[in-house]
């Protein structure tokens, strides 16, 4: 929640549900999908920038292709450059996401580019009084992005190793243990462990870095003359009027005026969002599994098939 004056923090989901219901009644069903177009554009722009920089410099775009410390540092530098370039457009996308549909005109699909370029042109001295120059936002945004990325990769690898170790220990006690299994063989169970580790790491990163994102989002929104829905009532709108000088000033002001819980404003919305993500993943996995079973030729399972389905643990 980017507004610092709201009384309801909505740290748990159930306090947010009545407000969301009122927003739906007063607006329309798309109120929770605001900014989805610009968000997708910014994500696509990020991938495009990474691809261009990678092809221009020869730096690895994927961390799995890093075979040395130098290549790892090049990969991290590529990520930093990409995040820095898209920061102005991320700011524009964030405004579209949080602004009220009642008090603001609905943005066109490509307005994110116009607003992003405007912030680049106002690099040093923004035309709007309280807006921070984009260079003052780039460093904390890049720092958050790269730290979150490295933490995600690290936790994912650790989780994957733990899950494989648990499964390996379980199957070593069974008759299916076979050390001569081909390590290069593809197995859907390996992919299942990788998916679970990726989901767990993603959820953990969203929760851990939520307070930092709250601060950075407030810096992005400051001075943009954005009017947001009043989430205390769900029936009115309020402007965002802040005057932070930077990341630490925003952090200290939040702690002083709102307490530590002010860093977790809107955490209940994140819980609902993650629950929706898990539901979609579960539903998609179920549908794909059912379709795969329907397309498979009828075949009675054998003990050999069962053994092969478990040997993936020893690669």
Language-model regions: role of each:
Residues 1-315:
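Matrix-facing interhelical linker segments
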């Amino acid at each position: 929640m980017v507004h610092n004056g709201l009384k309801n923090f909505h740290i748990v989901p159930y306090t947010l549900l009545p407000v969301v219901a009122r927003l739906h009644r007063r607006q329309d069903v798309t109120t929770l999908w605001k900014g989805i177009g610009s968000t997708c554009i910014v994500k696509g722009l990020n991938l495009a920038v990474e691809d261009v920089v990678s092809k221009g410099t020869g730096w690895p775009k994927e961390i799995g292709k890093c075979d040395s410390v130098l290549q790892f540092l090049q990969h991290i530098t590529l990520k930093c450059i990409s995040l820095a370039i898209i920061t102005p457009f991320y700011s524009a996308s964030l405004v579209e996401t949080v602004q009220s549909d009642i008090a603001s005109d609905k943005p066109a699909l490509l307005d994110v580019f116009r607003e992003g370029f405007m912030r680049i042109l106002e690099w040093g001295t923004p035309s709007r009084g309280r807006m921070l120059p984009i260079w003052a936002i780039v460093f904390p945004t890049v720092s958050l992005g790269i730290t979150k990325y490295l933490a995600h990769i690290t936790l994912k690898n650790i989780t994957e190793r733990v899950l494989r170790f648990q499964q390996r220990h379980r199957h070593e006690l069974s008759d299916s243990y076979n050390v001569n299994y081909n390590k290069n063989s593809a197995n859907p169970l390996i992919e299942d462990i990788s998916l679970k580790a990726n989901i767990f790491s993603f959820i953990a990163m969203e929760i851990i870095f939520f307070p930092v994102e709250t601060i950075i989002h407030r810096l992005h929104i400051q001075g943009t003359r954005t009017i947001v829905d009043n989430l205390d009532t769900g029936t009115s709108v309020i402007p965002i009027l802040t005057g932070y000088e930077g990341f630490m000033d925003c952090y200290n002001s939040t702690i002083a005026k709102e307490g530590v819980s002010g860093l977790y404003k809107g955490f209940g919305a994140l819980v609902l969002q993650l629950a929706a993500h898990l539901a979609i993943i579960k539903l998609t996995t179920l549908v794909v599994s059912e379709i795969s079973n329907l397309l498979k030729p009828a075949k009675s399972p054998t003990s050999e098939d069962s053994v092969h389905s478990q040997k993936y643990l020893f690669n």
